Design a protein with these regions (language model features):
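Active-site-proximal, Lys/Arg-enriched surface segment
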Residues: 36, 67-173, 308, 313
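Short gly/ser-rich anion-binding loops that grip negatively charged ligand groups
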Residues: 40, 53, 71, 96, ...
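Single, function-defining residue in the core of a domain
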Residues: 1-23, 96-99, 110-114, 154-367
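Hydrophobic, Leu/Ile/Phe/Ala-enriched alpha-helical segments that form helix-helix packing faces
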Residues: 39-40, 54, 89, 218-225
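A residue-level signal for conserved active-site and pocket-lining positions in enzyme catalytic cores
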Residues: 50, 138, 342
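Gly/serine-rich nucleotide phosphate-binding loop at the start of the catalytic core
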Residues: 1-70, 74-76
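Short, contiguous clusters of charged residues that form electrostatic/catalytic patches at enzyme active sites
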Residues: 34, 133-136, 212-219
């Protein structure tokens, strides 16, 4: 059953007053309140449905015009929202050392392809490629206080540069494979030539990777003066470039570590069950090859949030990242099944401290 929006919800009327001066007239302000009300009370939160349920709107395109054309600044509204949230939670937030910025990404799936920048993005949870907008997001967490900060829209390189179009222009006989590895090979073969085309080169310069977007979100949080010291992130954000940005801003970080990442062999020593050093060949060892070498006796039971984990931790060096501490964690004493690998720049933290911090990242799943 659809609920008609006759007037703004009471909580919206009360809180929206903070934003009143950001809108040029009463109509813009009313659209703002109606849109927020629709997001709260309607199950279907699409713009079309909110417009349909707003009874006092003579023209159902008014709300669309308000969001896309009206002369108000989304950035000013965003900044005011964050300032207001921080001011309202001063007594509830913890110290900066116990506060976090969480980086994540999300797929906003769509049925049709009429939306601007909608594209097929990889969904790692079910190995599919749905039509969606792919957002890189930032969230603030400090004790009981948690709320989203901002987002950046990720656009695939091929979509930004109109890559297929330029391949056909310069290599009309070239077939473009669907498989990722084969497609990557075509990129290596053709992109240097495509970049000689001034139009393609201009589009290439406009592309922003997820790392670029994550850096932007971190910088925005620092410019806003958010009180925090630690960044929590997923494995695909862990790069030399992002780590260097965090080092410059003197921020700590904890991340998942992909199992195919290399460890520098000379940076650690692993011993067998008898305490004898295990000789390792080569200069690098993948995490997935390192884990089977760890004796069961080296794992320690660690309790976090009333859940037991069996953890091994040591300091290693990762190419491009430097010296870090890693934690290999199983959820059972038999060390069977899947495991997680965490990594942090804080080599002085214990396995419990690292686990406890990273597990806070899951709080955003309920936002």
């Amino acid at each position: 059953m659809q609920l008609p929006i006759v007037t703004a919800a009471p909580i919206v009327k009360e809180r929206a007053k903070v934003f009143r001066d950001l809108f040029g007239d009463e109509r813009q302000y009313r659209h703002f309140q109606n849109y927020l009300t629709g997001l709260i009370v309607l199950e279907n939160k699409s713009l079309a449905n909110i417009s349909r349920c707003t009874l006092k709107s003579a023209d159902k395109t008014n709300l669309s015009w308000f969001l896309s054309e009206a002369p108000w600044s989304p950035r000013e509204v965003q900044n005011r929202r964050i300032e207001y949230m921080m001011a309202q939670t001063t007594s509830l937030r913890q110290a900066a050392t116990a506060s976090y910025l969480i980086l994540d990404d999300a797929l906003c799936e769509h049925v049709g392809s009429l939306f601007e920048y909608v594209d097929r993005h990889y969904n790692h949870s079910d190995d599919s490629f749905p039509l969606a907008h792919n957002l890189v997001t930032s969230h603030y967490l400090s004790g009981a206080v948690r709320f989203p900060i901002d987002f950046e829209l990720y656009r695939r390189y091929e979509e930004v540069t109109r890559w297929s179009e330029f391949v056909f222009k310069h290599f009309p006989q070239q077939e473009i494979p669907r498989q990722a590895k084969a497609r990557a090979k075509v990129h290596r073969q053709l992109d240097a030539t495509l970049l000689k085309d001034p139009e393609f080169a201009t589009l290439d310069g406009q592309f922003r990777s997820k790392i670029d977007l994550a850096k932007s979100l971190i910088e925005q949080s620092i410019e806003r003066g958010l009180s925090l010291t630690t960044i929590l992130m997923d494995s695909w954000y862990l790069s030399a470039e992002l780590v260097e940005t965090l080092r410059q801003y003197q921020k700590d970080w904890v991340s998942l570590l992909k199992r195919n990442r290399n460890l520098e062999v000379h940076s650690f020593q692993i011993k067998d069950a008898q305490g004898q050093p295990i000789a390792l060949e080569g200069s690098h060892l993948k995490v997935e090859d390192f884990v089977p070498l760890i004796p069961q006796e080296s794992y320690r039971k660690t309790r976090v949030n009333e859940q037991d984990y069996w953890c091994f931790t040591c300091c290693v060096r990762i190419p491009g990242i430097g010296k870090v501490r890693i934690v290999i964690s199983f959820d059972n004493s038999q060390l069977s099944g899947t495991y997680a690998v965490l990594v942090t720049n804080r080599t002085d933290w214990s396995a419990k401290e690292i686990l406890d911090r990273y597990l806070k990242r899951w709080s955003i799943e309920t936002l």
